[in-house]
Design a protein with these regions (language model features):
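N-terminal secretory/targeting leader peptides
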Residues: 1-3, 13-203
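Cys/His-rich zinc-coordinating modules
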Residues: 7
């Protein structure tokens, strides 16, 4: 997440800032959570096992990944995932490893499959109200700006990574089965994702 967050900031500054997506507010940082993993109630032996399963997916690229893999998408806000998994509304979820601890998913999804390179990465922006920023003292404003940008992006990514380490430790302690997807599965995954990338580039 740290490397992805720094890369995200640099790419934004070089190529995307000109689009002025954050017009009217001040962008102080960009970050990406750690690599999403596949968390399921039953073991995953191949990507075909995901077809038709009720998987909670996020919006954006995560939703596109789920669609390409043939899952039955369950759209829920993150705070609702534990309940959805514990009551059978969902069979699994695509989220980072840290959620095994932070969302207590170790209690409801005992199987985790790690896709080398990550299933996907979700992005976030840190923004500040311009009026609020203008109302601060010059010293306070400069202090905020001084730790913003790439510094804040890197720090956020660093904390995402640390949370994933904690999540992995909690999962192991709980007896969660953790498997790394084979080279064959990863190859198939990348082949499936080629169309997702093409659609994104074309959009």
């Amino acid at each position: 997440a740290e490397a992805a967050s720094v890369a995200y900031w640099r790419v934004h500054q070089k190529y995307l800032a000109k689009a002025d997506e954050h017009k009217g507010v001040t962008l102080v940082g960009l970050t990406s959570h750690g690599p999403a993993v596949i968390q399921t109630k039953s073991p995953l032996n191949s990507l075909d096992d995901l077809r038709g399963q009720k998987i909670r997916v996020p919006g954006g690229v995560g939703s596109s990944v789920g669609k390409a893999l043939g899952v039955t998408a369950v759209k829920l806000p993150a705070p609702k995932v534990y309940e959805a998994l514990s009551t059978g509304v969902a069979d699994g979820i695509f989220m980072p490893m840290e959620t095994q601890k932070s969302f207590r998913l170790k209690e409801v999804v005992p199987h985790v499959t790690i896709m080398p390179g990550g299933l996907y990465y979700g992005s976030f922006a840190f923004i500040m109200n311009n009026d609020f920023l203008a109302g601060l003292s010059e010293n306070d404003r400069n202090a905020i700006i001084g730790v913003s940008g790439e510094k804040l992006s890197q720090l956020a990514g660093e904390h995402w990574d640390a949370a994933d380490v904690d999540g992995l430790a909690a999962a192991k302690e709980a007896g969660t089965t953790i498997n790394k997807a084979s080279a064959e599965i990863r190859k198939k995954y990348l082949e499936i994702m080629a169309s997702v990338e093409q659609d994104w580039v074309a959009s």
